[in-house]
Amino acid sequence: LTAASCTLLWSCAAGNAPLSDALSALTAQVFASGDASVQSARLDSNYRYLRVDVDGHPSALLVLGYVDPHPQGDIEVWYSGTGEVIRIQNGRIVATSGLSLDWRAVRFPSTPPAWTAVPPQGVFYQRSRDEMPEHRYAITDSVLTTPAPLGPTFSTAGTLALAQSPTVRWFRDDILNSSAAPLPPAWFAWDTYRGQPTVVYSRQCLSATFCLQLLRWPLQEGAL
């Protein structure tokens, strides 16, 4: 993290307690401990949490540090207790830091369509991204967003629970053309969380073999 980011990490708060306290508590309970610890972690209702699952790694919880206003949609900045940062805009990853493979920046020449405005036949958008540690810049993707009648065929704790909800709407992003190696489809579940319509779950791949599953946590709103 940069010095400025570290300053934000230790000073930002969603409630009365500093964010560093929430992160320290999560680090002690969860990180490198796996799914069972995530399930039993004691969460602070002053904060918002994001569960992150990566194949071959223990589950982790991230804390929402702050929301950065942006003309194309607010950017949520999520922190782990061990230094990773994920930035999310309208459900899509727009930057990461501290991962084994990072998308340092994602740019949209024009704003991707709102989820509720995606037509049945789908809609295209363009994306440019920078990738580290390979030092690859301005990778361009042409992406097709379509509604999906069902969720993904793979099963996780998050997708199984969401599959039973009659209110969830599924979408997928397919890269039809790219200046880099193709990526697997990205999946998004749209629903209401804490009274606000939002992406509650997604599976997004930063490479063909490095995929992140992001789930707002706890999934059951009354659990916190």
Which ranges hold each PLM region?
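Acidic, serine/threonine-rich low-complexity disordered tracts
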Residues: 13-88, 92-105, 117, 122-224
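C-terminal motif of bacterial Sec signal peptides marking the signal peptidase cleavage site
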Residues: 8-11
